[in-house]
């Protein structure tokens, strides 16, 4: 009977996109990291791990169990209850069964600790490789055979936002190039690839945007997702890097022109940017309804961007449940989730994260549904009228 109920639900329910930040651990120390990942590196034989704000490092004790520095750092965090064990991650997969899901296995750097490779294999076995996206960085990917990994994922995503400036860079110097170097190998064997480019004050120049597009074109990358810069995670610390509406429009126009000439990568706009090209009947913000975040403690969030500078849920209002402890069926059926989903169209077009950040209501949940996203202050009425 349960199997029949699952089949009936999967035939009618929407696809649930879940970005699963499987670990906080990363080998990079990006200033705008939207999940406030912890930086891990080795120096003079010692493994060091940062706080989410990068303000302090501590030494990871040697537990005698071997592995690379990231494996050691993961076990260190697991011993403190800061990240899920492999058994708990498999319990999450159990609790997703019976639903149409698309899992984006992300981080931190998802593949820096080796146990996550097994997690990807198991997720692909249960849900099918086409339901699995991997978002990773060059160094994380470098430790794995491309063909073997390609057999477990439907798409590879990676961040590529151009060369950082010499002064106050938001990314380490080789971050983007190392990501593309590895992604090129996946594209060469036919794996679907998508570059993700947060638009910031540091990459808006048409020359830089052209360089970004042409490097992706030459590497055979299929898609380029233009993203809004969210002041979440460590991005809270650099609000001046967020472009204006006109800067966003100009950047999109530049890349659309290149797309028209070269055909690929295909330019896609993240939900938060689509209304800049005109009104749409479908609500571009699908937070809480079809798009969710899942953090490294198993907490299901109403948006993948609901993370603060400490790498924690941005506010209890965004917390929907814990997938280690409860099934997705139970969480989606809760009074809180049903209430929030019923209100999703109230601020059509507005990004619910920006509405929450800029709203004036005393209640956090109320702010999520306000028409207070500053990007749409001049176009929200038109967009809402098209709904």
Q: Where do the PLM segments sit?
A:
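Flexible mid-to-C-terminal extensions adjoining Fe-S/redox cofactors in radical SAM and related proteins
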Residues: 1-16, 36-72, 305-387
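Core AdoMet radical
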Residues: 17, 38-84, 99-113, 124-141, ...
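Radical SAM enzyme [4Fe-4S]-AdoMet core and its adjacent flexible, acidic
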Residues: 21, 41-46, 63, 152-155, ...
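Cysteine-centered iron-sulfur cluster-binding motifs in ferredoxin-type domains/subunits
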Residues: 21-30, 36, 109
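Short cysteine clusters
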Residues: 26, 30-33, 285, 303, ...
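Glycine/alanine-rich phosphate-binding loops at beta-alpha junctions
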Residues: 87, 93
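Generic structural signal for hydrophobic
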Residues: 96, 123-124, 148-149, 186, ...
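Distinct, well-ordered alpha-helical segments
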Residues: 116-121, 142-150, 205-213
């Amino acid at each position: 009977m349960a199997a029949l109920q699952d089949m009936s639900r999967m035939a009618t329910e929407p696809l649930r996109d879940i970005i699963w930040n499987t670990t906080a651990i990363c080998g990079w120390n990006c200033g705008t990291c939207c999940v406030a990942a912890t930086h891990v590196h080795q120096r003079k034989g010692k493994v060091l791990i940062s706080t989410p704000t990068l303000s302090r490092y501590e030494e990871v004790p040697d537990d005698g169990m071997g592995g690379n520095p990231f494996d050691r750092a993961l076990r260190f965090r697991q011993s403190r209850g800061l990240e899920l064990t492999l058994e708990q991650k498999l319990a999450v997969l159990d609790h997703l069964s019976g639903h149409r899901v698309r899992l984006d296995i992300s981080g931190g750097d998802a593949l820096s600790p080796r146990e996550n490779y097994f997690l990807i294999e198991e997720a692909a076995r249960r849900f099918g490789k086409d339901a699995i996206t991997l978002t990773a960085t060059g160094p994380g990917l470098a430790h794995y055979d491309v063909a073997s990994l390609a057999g477990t994922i439907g798409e590879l995503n990676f961040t590529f936002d151009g060369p950082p400036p010499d002064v106050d860079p938001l990314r380490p110097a080789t971050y983007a190039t190392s990501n593309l170097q590895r992604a090129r190998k996946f594209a060469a064997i036919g794996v679907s690839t998508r570059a993700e480019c947060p638009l910031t004050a540091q990459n808006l120049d048409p020359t830089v945007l052209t360089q970004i597009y042409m490097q992706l074109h030459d590497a055979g990358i299929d898609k380029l997702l233009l993203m809004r810069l969210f002041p979440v995670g460590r991005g809270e610390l650099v609000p001046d890097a967020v472009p204006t509406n006109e800067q966003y429009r100009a950047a999109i126009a530049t890349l659309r022109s290149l797309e028209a000439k070269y055909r690929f990568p295909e330019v896609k706009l993240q939900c938060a940017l689509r209304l800049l090209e005109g009104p749409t009947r479908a609500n571009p913000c699908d937070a809480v309804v079809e798009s969710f975040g899942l953090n490294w403690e198993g907490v299901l969030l109403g948006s993948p961007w609901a993370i603060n500078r400490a790498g924690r849920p941005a506010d209890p209002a965004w917390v929907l449940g814990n997938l280690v402890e409860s099934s997705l069926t139970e969480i989606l059926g809760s009074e809180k989730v049903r209430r929030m989903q019923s209100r999703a169209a109230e601020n059509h077009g507005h990004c619910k994260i920006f509405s929450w950040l800029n709203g004036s209501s005393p209640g956090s949940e109320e702010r999520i549904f306000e028409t207070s996203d500053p990007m749409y202050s001049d176009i929200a009425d038109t967009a809402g009228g098209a709904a």
